[in-house]
Regions:
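Walker A/P-loop phosphate-binding motif and the immediately C-terminal alpha-helix
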Residues: 3-40
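Gly/Ser/Thr-rich helix-start
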Residues: 10-13, 50, 118
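Short, electropositive, low-hydrophobicity segments enriched in small/polar residues
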Residues: 13-15, 53, 113
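Short, glycine/charged-enriched secondary-structure capping and boundary segments
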Residues: 21-22, 48-51, 120-122
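N-terminal phosphate/diphosphate-binding loop that engages ATP/GTP or pyrophosphate donors
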Residues: 25-101
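Cytosolic-facing regulatory segments adjacent to core modules
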Residues: 81-96, 107-127
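Conserved beta-strand scaffold positions in the cores of enzyme catalytic domains, especially
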Residues: 103-105
Length: 127
């Protein structure tokens, strides 16, 4: 049985802490857990207890412009495009995920500068 749990809410209310705790609990019960951090201020790695040296190895999806264009059909940081809402996501978690305590973590990444464009194609890959 596959289950997707999405958590959203106001900033500073403990979403990352809750998600990290749930992910670790599910993993400790033997479930395969993929945790996805789509927060521009990504802190789920810390909530999962990843050591600093492992956090520095995280490669974010938003950095992969060619992958995003290939899978969604849209150029990154451009407006007014039509793109696939159901892109092929095969291999993404294996390639970009980092494992710790039974949880595989994938991080979207942050908008680096004001006016950086729409992050819609990147976000579609996370569905």
């Amino acid at each position: 049985m596959a289950l997707k749990i999405a958590v959203s809410g106001k900033g500073g209310v403990g979403k990352s802490t809750l998600c990290g705790t749930l992910a670790l609990l599910f993993a400790s019960d033997g479930f395969d857990v993929l945790a996805i951090d789509a927060d521009p201020d990504a802190n789920l790695a810390s909530a999962l207890g990843l050591p600093v040296e492992k956090r520095e190895q995280i490669h974010t999806i938003s950095e992969e412009k060619e992958l995003i264009e290939e899978r969604t059909g849209a150029k990154v940081a451009q407006f007014g495009q039509v793109f696939s809402l159901n892109p092929d996501v095969a291999g993404i978690s294996e390639r970009y995920g980092i494992s710790h305590n039974g949880v595989n973590l994938v991080v979207l990444g942050a908008v680096k500068r004001a006016g950086g464009g729409c992050a819609c194609p990147e976000s579609v890959l996370l569905k």
